[in-house]
């Protein structure tokens, strides 16, 4: 199982980097070209959500993205460290504090896009943070051609 | 790749041509542009998305916010988009029912319903 791990400060400008890296690794692992747009969008949504959660909870830890190449599938895990006492519940903070409803609506919309795009998706959250795991089928390259 | 924005007036419509990527980083610029237009009295907007390479839910949120603002002034917000990858995002979120989506700026500018 080959893995690429990416950690980035919870800043909106780094979400694009995460999309680019995820798409590059997905392509390399043999994910169908037609599906790469979906991978890009889904990982962007998951990272956007994690950045929002870190900022609204005042968490300085980076957002973590794992890109996992397996034999028959390619998986992406996006983890945040925002604690929830109940799913979706947030700690008030600086980011979007003036309009918490709008932020929560965008968060919901991000999840709606992910579940609309990806067939194989798991969303979990607990007191130590949340995790979105998404998988796509792949066809790994049969052999390395120099 | 960043976000590019330019506006022009066609009759009583204001066409906003958007290019590049609309995501969590760039969407605030689009939001500012739409808010500014409405504050300046432009209530009939056509957002031309033909140059957009990427759109996420943050961008959708900004467009919905724009629609809400123009509707408060009995205005309209129409989209121009032919790209399947972008249209798909409107479909899976059900927003094709919310936004009139046109195939050309000419068509959007002429539309009245």
From Swiss-Prot, chain B:
Q: Does the keyword Ion transport apply?
A: no
User: Matching InterPro entries, A to Z?
Assistant: Anti-sigma_ant (IPR003658), STAS_dom (IPR002645), STAS_dom_sf (IPR036513)
- Residues modified as Phosphoserine are 57
> What keywords tag this UniProt record?
Phosphoprotein
Domain STAS, chain residue ranges per copy: 3-112
Q: How is it modified after translation?
A: Phosphorylated by RsbW on a serine residue.
- Has UniProt tagged this entry with the keyword Disulfide bond? no
**Entry-linked PANTHER family:** ANTI-SIGMA FACTOR ANTAGONIST TM_1081-RELATED (PTHR33495:SF2), ANTI-SIGMA FACTOR ANTAGONIST TM_1081-RELATED-RELATED (PTHR33495)
Q: What does this protein do?
A: Positive regulator of sigma-B activity. Non-phosphorylated RsbV binds to RsbW, preventing its association with sigma-B. When phosphorylated, releases RsbW, which is then free to complex with and inactivate sigma-B.
Q: Which NCBIfam families match?
A: ant_ant_sig (TIGR00377)
Q: Please report the name of this protein according to its UniProt entry.
A: Anti-sigma-B factor antagonist
Q: Which organism is it from?
A: Streptomyces coelicolor (strain ATCC BAA-471 / A3(2) / M145)
């Amino acid at each position: 199982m080959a893995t690429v791990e990416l950690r980035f400060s919870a800043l909106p400008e780094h979400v694009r980097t995460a999309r680019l890296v995820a798409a590059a690794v997905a392509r390399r692992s043999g994910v169908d070209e037609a599906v790469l747009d979906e991978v890009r969008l889904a990982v962007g949504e998951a990272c956007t959500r994690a950045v929002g959660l870190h900022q609204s909870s005042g968490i300085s830890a980076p957002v973590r993205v794992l890109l996992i190449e397996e034999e028959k599938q390619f998986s992406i895990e996006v983890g945040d460290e925002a604690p929830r006492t109940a799913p979706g519940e947030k700690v008030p903070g600086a980011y979007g504090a003036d309009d918490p409803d709008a932020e929560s609506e965008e968060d919901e919309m991000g999840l709606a896009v992910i579940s609309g795009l990806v067939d194989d998706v798991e969303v979990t959250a607990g007191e130590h943070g949340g995790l979105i795991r998404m998988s796509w089928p792949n066809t790994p390259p049969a052999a390395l051609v120099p | 790749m960043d976000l590019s924005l330019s506006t022009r007036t066609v009759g009583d419509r204001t066409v906003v041509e958007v290019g590049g990527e609309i995501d969590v980083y760039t969407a605030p610029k689009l939001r500012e542009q739409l808010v500014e237009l409405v504050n300046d009295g432009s209530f009939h907007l056509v957002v031309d998305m033909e140059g957009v390479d990427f759109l996420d839910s943050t961008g959708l949120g900004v467009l919905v916010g724009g629609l809400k603002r123009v509707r408060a002034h009995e205005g309209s917000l129409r989209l121009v988009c032919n790209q399947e990858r972008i249209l798909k995002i409107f479909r899976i979120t059900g927003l094709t029912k919310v936004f009139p989506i046109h195939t050309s700026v000419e068509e959007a500018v002429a539309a009245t319903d």
